[in-house]
């Protein structure tokens, strides 16, 4: 299994419950696809350097997980079609 890291920007106008629901959705998706969640780190609301989809702020969260490439691909696919996600980046961590 490979290690991956995803940084996700969520719409800033969500309620706390809805935000937690979005995070849980992706945290639960990883094991469903045969992966393993290593760490979830909520960074909170931060100001963006430039507007993204007409938003100047976003909630950030970091998701570290292990899995096959298909797990990362499915996570990216679901993030692309989610209206609550304004930007994301999934990268494979280097082996050390």
Swiss-Prot record:
InterPro entries: Ribosomal_bS6 (IPR000529), Ribosomal_bS6_sf (IPR035980), Ribosomal_S6_plastid/chlpt (IPR020814), Transl_elong_EF1B/ribsomal_bS6 (IPR014717). Gene3D superfamilies: 3.30.70.60. One of its GO terms (molecular function) is small ribosomal subunit rRNA binding. GO terms for cellular component: cytoplasm; ribonucleoprotein complex; ribosome. It comes from the Bacteria. GO terms for biological process: translation. Keywords: Ribonucleoprotein, Ribosomal protein, RNA-binding, rRNA-binding. Pfam families: Ribosomal_S6. PANTHER family: MITOCHONDRIAL 28S RIBOSOMAL PROTEIN S6, SMALL RIBOSOMAL SUBUNIT PROTEIN BS6M. Binds together with bS18 to 16S ribosomal RNA. Belongs to the bacterial ribosomal protein bS6 family. This is Small ribosomal subunit protein bS6. It comes from Heliobacterium modesticaldum (strain ATCC 51547 / Ice1).
């Amino acid at each position: 299994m490979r290690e991956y890291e995803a940084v996700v920007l969520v719409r800033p106008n969500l309620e706390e419950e809805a935000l937690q629901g979005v995070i849980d959705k992706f945290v639960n998706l990883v094991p469903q696809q045969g992966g393993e969640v290593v760490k979830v780190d909520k960074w909170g609301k931060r100001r963006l350097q430039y507007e993204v989809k007409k938003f100047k702020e976003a909630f950030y969260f970091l998701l570290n997980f292990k899995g096959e490439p298909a797990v990362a691909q499915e996570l990216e696919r679901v993030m692309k079609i989610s209206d609550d996600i304004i930007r994301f980046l999934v990268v494979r961590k280097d082996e050390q």
